[in-house]
């Protein structure tokens, strides 16, 4: 960061209902938004023609609006389908990039659907057990510890 802070420097930006630190570089500052990682923020900034070495607080209003529009409509800006975090949605078959509260609600809906159709994954979630095939004989124990009484 340069020693002189520009006149229109914002220390905290508000993008997609998330506070973003203006002192960090734009690419890394955008990762504070849930559902946005370094790779996705990198490709969005390249599509928006924004310098990656720029600090987030130095972005103008137009640049912020451009970032938001690209993030909300990634397919219109030629971001490939395999890059998105919601591919072939089970309900409508669309490809999209979910962020912040939309991501939380979609994940919750997916789990509710799995529980409702009584799929194996849904039942494991319901029982509070490991879902992805891990061993559970010794690890993942919660609750009260059961002691062993000593023989007299």
From Swiss-Prot:
- Localization: Cytoplasm
PROSITE patterns of this UniProt entry? RIBOSOMAL_S13_1 (PS00646), RIBOSOMAL_S13_2 (PS50159)
Keywords (A to Z) from UniProt: Cytoplasm, Ribonucleoprotein, Ribosomal protein, RNA-binding, rRNA-binding
Which Gene Ontology biological process is one annotated for this entry?
Answer: translation
Origin superkingdom: Eukaryota
Chief location: cytoplasm
Among InterPro entries, the record links this protein to: Rbsml_uS13_C, Ribosomal_uS13, Ribosomal_uS13-like_H2TH, Ribosomal_uS13_CS
Q: Where is this region: Disordered?
A: 133-152
Physiological role: Located at the top of the head of the 40S subunit, it contacts several helices of the 18S rRNA.
NCBIfam families recorded: PRK04053.1
The identity of this protein, by name, is Small ribosomal subunit protein uS13
Could you tell me which species this protein originates from?
Spodoptera frugiperda (Fall armyworm)
